[in-house]
Regions:
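Short aromatic-enriched loop/helix-cap "lid" or pocket-rim segments at secondary-structure transitions
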Residues: 63-64, 162-166
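Short, low-complexity N-terminal intrinsically disordered segments enriched in polar/charged residues
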Residues: 2, 17-55, 166-168
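Extended, well-structured beta-strand/loop surface patches
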Residues: 112, 125-126, 136
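A solvent-exposed, acidic/Ser-Thr-rich amphipathic alpha-helical stretch
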Residues: 28-29, 46-117, 131-132
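Short beta-strand edge/turn micro-motifs at domain boundaries
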Residues: 132-161
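Short beta-strand segments enriched in hydrophobic/aromatic residues
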Residues: 53, 118-120, 154-157
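Sequence/structural signature of outer-membrane beta-barrel proteins
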Residues: 60, 121-125, 159-162
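Sec-dependent N-terminal signal peptides
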Residues: 4-14
Length: 168
C-alpha cells in the first residue's frame, strides 16, 4: 500500500508542476495573446478577434452599454468598427500602464486579469490619423479547454481627446 501511496504522491507533484505556470510565464502569455487580439482589432480581422473571445463573453462599455455573447459583440464590432473601409479605429495601450495579474487555483493558472489604459486613434481616408480619446480597461482571460480566451471585458472611464492632434 505504501509504495502506491508514494507513487501517487510523486505523480501528483509532477503533474502539478507540469501543468502550473510561473507568474512570469502567464504574464508573458497573456501579453502575447492580448497583442495578437489588438493587432486583429486594429486591422478589423474579425475572424482572429473572434477566436480570442469566449462564447459567453460579457463586454461592458461605459458609453456603449453591455453585450453578453460573442455573436452580439462581433456583430457590433462588424457594424460599428469594420463596415466602412474609409474609417478605422486604432487602439494602442499606454506604455507602462498595462499589468497582468495571474489567477490560480491549487498553484495552476486558470485565468488572468490584464488592466491598464489605452488610447484610440481615428484613421479616415485622405486624413492624418488623430487621437480620439483614452480609457481604462480590465479584461479577464480564462483558460477554456486548453485555450486562453477573453471572458469578461470592461472598457471604462472614456474621455475625449483634450485636443485633436494628428499623429506623425
Amino acid at each position: 500500500m505504501y509504495p502506491k501511496l508514494i507513487f501517487a504522491t510523486i505523480l501528483s507533484i509532477f503533474a502539478t508542476s507540469a501543468f502550473s505556470q510561473s507568474d512570469h510565464e502567464v504574464q508573458a502569455l497573456i501579453l502575447e495573446k492580448d497583442s495578437i487580439f489588438w493587432k486583429a482589432y486594429n486591422n478589423c480581422d474579425v475572424d482572429v478577434m473572434e477566436s480570442y473571445i469566449a462564447e459567453d463573453v460579457e463586454f461592458y462599455h461605459d458609453l456603449g452599454g453591455a453585450s453578453k455573447t460573442r455573436d452580439t459583440m462581433m456583430a457590433i464590432t462588424k457594424k460599428n468598427l469594420c463596415s466602412n473601409p474609409d474609417f478605422r479605429l486604432r487602439r494602442e495601450a499606454v506604455p507602462g500602464t498595462v499589468k497582468v495579474f495571474p489567477m490560480k487555483k491549487n498553484g495552476a493558472a486558470y485565468g488572468a486579469i490584464i488592466a491598464g489604459e489605452h488610447l484610440f486613434y481615428i484613421n479616415q481616408a485622405g486624413k492624418k490619423e488623430f487621437l480620439d480619446g483614452d480609457a481604462s480597461f480590465s479584461h479577464l482571460w480564462l483558460l477554456n479547454n486548453g485555450k486562453w480566451v477573453m471572458s469578461r471585458i470592461f472598457s471604462y472611464d472614456h474621455h475625449a481627446a483634450k485636443q485633436t492632434s494628428a499623429v506623425k
